[in-house]
Amino acid sequence: MIGHANSGLNSWKYPCRTAVYAQNVPTATCQGCPASYISNDELQAYLKRAIARNQIDQQVRSVDVGKSGVAVGMVHRAKLEKPQPNSVAEHDHVSEVYHVISGSATLVTGPDLVDARRRPATNENVRLLNGPGANAASIRNGVTHELKAGDAIIIPAGTGHLFTKIDDHITYLMIRIDPDKVVPWKDEAASKTYLSQQ
């Protein structure tokens, strides 16, 4: 209570105090970052190149979004009766999301890898697509997924994945989540340069 000299209240006064509280003002994790647009024409150019060159996985974009990197790839796999030896893939830092555009396939996933062997640092996939990781002979107690057009699947970093059968082909858009930023950046200009190469 604050006293007033001419009131019936106490004639003494308390000093006036103002409480100041620190406020946590939310800030974006990526300050001033532009959006990255990819046209269907550009994606189709990657698909055409993949089919013509039998090139399975191509990075379309890889961008910094603040606390993480995000990449978009176009993947096209031809018919597969059975997998090649030691073709289970695992990525240490990069998680992947597949959205199937066309075709169908059987994919096995799981974290318990059998006879895993590190990929060399010079491997093109390690350098350009999904960072350090391993290949393995098989997946112990793996889960089987029957993928078809329209489906999506999330494969966390450290989870092995293996296509055991591809009926005719499978084409999917790949989203890579790269929190440790192990994958090199690729912007629109770099993409155009890549596509222009013969």
Task: Describe the residue ranges of each PLM region.
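A short hydrophobic beta-strand segment most commonly corresponding to one strand
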Residues: 168-184
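Conserved metal-binding segment of the jelly-roll/cupin
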Residues: 146-160, 164-166
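Short, conserved beta-strand element in jelly-roll/cupin
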Residues: 92-107, 111, 122-133
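A short, N-terminal "cap"/entry segment at the start of jelly-roll beta-barrel domains
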Residues: 20-92, 185-193, 197-198
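Short, structured beta-strand/loop micro-motifs enriched in basic residues and often containing a Trp
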Residues: 131-141
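His/acidic/aromatic-lined binding-pocket segments of jelly-roll/cupin-type domains
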Residues: 89, 95-99, 144-145, 152-153
